[in-house]
């Protein structure tokens, strides 16, 4: 059974302590230039991890990813004239 996972972006003051982020979830990406890390963890533990991370001295701020809540399947609503134009060529 798969668990639902959600990402969070952790903005850091310095990258020296970036290894300490491993205990909060899977570290997916660390940007050296912009000083942030993307971490994935279980959705059930997200709030607890965000509270712990924001209390650490080397963390500027923590933002959750909203990707699980965004609708990824779109419906196309074409009017009859455009639908006819698309079918003419075939």
Swiss-Prot record:
Subcellular location: Cytoplasm
Recorded GO CC terms: cytoplasm
Keywords noted in UniProt: Cytoplasm
One family name in Pfam for this protein: DUF2129
Family membership: Belongs to the UPF0298 family.
HAMAP family in UniProt: UPF0298
Protein name: UPF0298 protein BPUM_1393
Protein source organism: Bacillus pumilus (strain SAFR-032)
């Amino acid at each position: 059974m798969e668990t639902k996972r959600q990402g969070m972006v952790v903005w850091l003051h310095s990258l020296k302590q970036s290894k300490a982020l491993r205990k909060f979830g899977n570290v997916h990406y660390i940007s050296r230039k912009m000083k942030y890390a993307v971490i994935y963890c279980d959705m059930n533990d997200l709030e607890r991890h965000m509270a712990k991370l924001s209390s650490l001295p080397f963390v500027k701020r923590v933002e959750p990813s909203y990707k699980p809540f965004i609708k990824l399947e779109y419906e196309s609503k074409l009017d009859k004239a455009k639908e006819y134009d698309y079918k003419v060529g075939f």
